[in-house]
Curated annotation (Swiss-Prot):
GTP binds at residues 25-32, 48, 70, 126-129, 160-161. This is ADP-ribosylation factor 1. SUPFAM superfamilies: P-loop containing nucleoside triphosphate hydrolases. Its EC number is 3.6.5.2. One of its GO terms (molecular function) is GTPase activity.
Length: 181
C-alpha cells in the first residue's frame, strides 16, 4: 500500500519527465529556442552539427529536450533520436518563404515514422518579429497541419530572441502530454 500511495503522490504532485525532440530546418532557431527556455537569455549560436541536450523545467514537468542539427546532410541521423520521444517541437523560420515547402516535406516524412506515431506535435512558427514573417495560420496551411490525424498538434507563433510564445507552447505540450498518460 505504501508503494501505491507513493506512486500516486508522485504522479499527482511530483516532477514528471518528458523526452522532447526539437527539429526543423537549419537556421530556424532551434538552438536559440532551447537556450532561451533553459537560461532565459539569448546566446550566440553556430550551426548545430550533432545535437544539444538540456533539461528544461516547466511547472512540474522536466522536459529533456534534444536539439538536433537541421542541415540536409545530417537529417538522416534524426531517426536515431526517435525512440521514446513523447513530443516533437518542429521549429519553422516564419520569414523563410523559399523553404516552407522543404519544411513541409521533412515534417511529413517524420509524421510517417512509426516510432513517432504517439508523439504530440508542437510547431513553433518562429521569428514572428520579422516584418515579412508568415502568420501561424499561413504556416498551418503551408505545412498541411489540418491533415494530421490521430495525434495532438498545435502551432504557436514565437520569437525565440524575445521569448514570446515559447512558454505558451510548453503549456500546450505539457497539457497534451499529461492528457495522454
Amino acid at each position: 500500500m505504501g508503494l501505491f500511495a507513493s506512486k500516486l503522490f508522485s504522479n499527482l504532485f511530483g516532477n514528471k519527465e518528458m523526452r522532447i525532440l526539437m527539429v526543423g530546418l537549419d537556421g530556424a532557431g532551434k538552438t536559440t529556442v532551447l537556450y532561451k527556455l533553459k537560461l532565459g537569455e539569448v546566446i550566440t549560436t553556430i550551426p548545430t552539427i550533432g545535437f544539444n541536450v538540456e533539461t528544461v523545467q516547466y511547472k512540474n514537468i522536466s522536459f529533456t529536450v534534444w536539439d538536433v542539427g537541421g542541415q540536409d546532410r545530417i537529417r538522416s541521423l534524426w531517426r536515431h533520436y526517435y525512440r521514446n520521444t513523447e513530443g516533437v517541437i518542429f521549429v519553422v523560420d516564419s520569414n523563410d518563404r523559399s523553404r516552407i515547402g522543404e519544411a513541409r516535406e521533412v515534417m511529413q516524412r517524420m509524421l510517417n515514422e512509426d516510432e513517432l506515431r504517439n508523439a504530440a506535435w508542437l510547431v513553433f512558427a518562429n521569428k514572428q518579429d520579422l516584418p515579412e514573417a508568415m502568420s501561424a495560420a499561413e504556416i498551418t496551411e503551408k505545412l498541411g497541419l489540418h491533415s494530421i490525424r490521430n495525434r495532438p498538434w498545435f502551432i504557436q507563433a514565437t520569437c525565440a530572441t524575445s521569448g514570446e510564445g515559447l512558454y505558451e507552447g510548453l503549456e500546450w505540450l505539457s497539457n497534451s502530454l499529461k492528457n495522454s498518460t
